[in-house]
Amino acid sequence: MSDRSTGAVRAVLAPEPVPSSAAAAAPAEAAGGRAQAPQPAPLAPGARFFPSLAAVYRAQLSRARVARIPLLFVATFQSVGIMILMRGVVDGGSEARAVVAGSSVLVVAFVALNLLAQYFGQLRAGGGLDHYATLPVPPASVVLGAAAAYASFTLPGTLVTAVVGCLLFGLPMSGLWILAAVVPLAGAALAGLGAALGLLAPRQELATLAGQLGMSAALLLGVLPPERMPDVIVWARDLLPSTYGVEAFARTFAPRPDWAAVALDLGVCGAVGVLSLAVATWAYRRAAVR
């Protein structure tokens, strides 16, 4: 190959000369790229409380309708059976009012306290809280939505139990409308207590045990007439959130109900409900970060 052809090949393969200004700008651009690191994309704003609460409530209510309807029948049948048994030893008066009111609120305790304690205990044991923790919703909306769904789910069973009890003991049905206030207030108090028990229990079995014990306390302290209880049991009865719902409902069976006392009982029940739901929200935050 001649020297002329060799020089032509080298000229083709050789890179084009870079101008001095471009060569000086290249390091500057590289340095600038290192100085200006890519910024992370901004996160989406968190969901507002009330829309999140409504979404959790609808989801939990639809789940309860599918999975909890048989248990609602069990709770209603259990309360009706207790009233039938008590009919043989209680004739009427204040004792009959206590039996009917306590059996009706027992349906709320069975679902809102017992089942909700088991539900949150299962969520914590199975890692289900991690799913809720990844959602952009406030922790309070998760607890309040589940509690409201379980409490409102008990209204049909409570109403059926109250109607059957009025027929068994010959009590007036004119005050059954008070259940529209008793069920949500007592349900909120019991659901908050059940959620707190389920979230604070270190094991799922202990959450189930706590829910069962709470329901048994609501049964023994709510259905039995307080006049026949020792003073120590009466004091323990006053510590149970459902007691004030039972008292408010029982007062409506009187010939002339003391509506001021009914309002006071409902107010205490609502205050206990706010406190128990606040404790349940704190327990949810505590369990979600562990």
What are these regions (language model features)?
Residues 2-39, 86, 167, 254-256, ...:
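Junction motif at the cytosolic side of a transmembrane helix
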Residues 85, 96-168:
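Hydrophobic alpha-helical transmembrane segments of multi-pass membrane transport proteins
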Residues 58-77, 263, 289-290:
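Membrane-interface helix starts
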Residues 87-90, 201-243:
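Transmembrane helix segments
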Residues 66-92, 97-112, 213-219, 271:
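Hydrophobic alpha-helical transmembrane segments of multi-pass membrane transport/permease proteins
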Residues 33-55, 232-242:
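Short, membrane-interfacial amphipathic segments enriched in basic
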Residues 222-277:
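Membrane-interfacial helix-loop-helix junctions in multi-pass membrane proteins
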Residues 139-140, 144-211, 259-266, 270, ...:
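Alpha-helical transmembrane segments and their short interhelical loops
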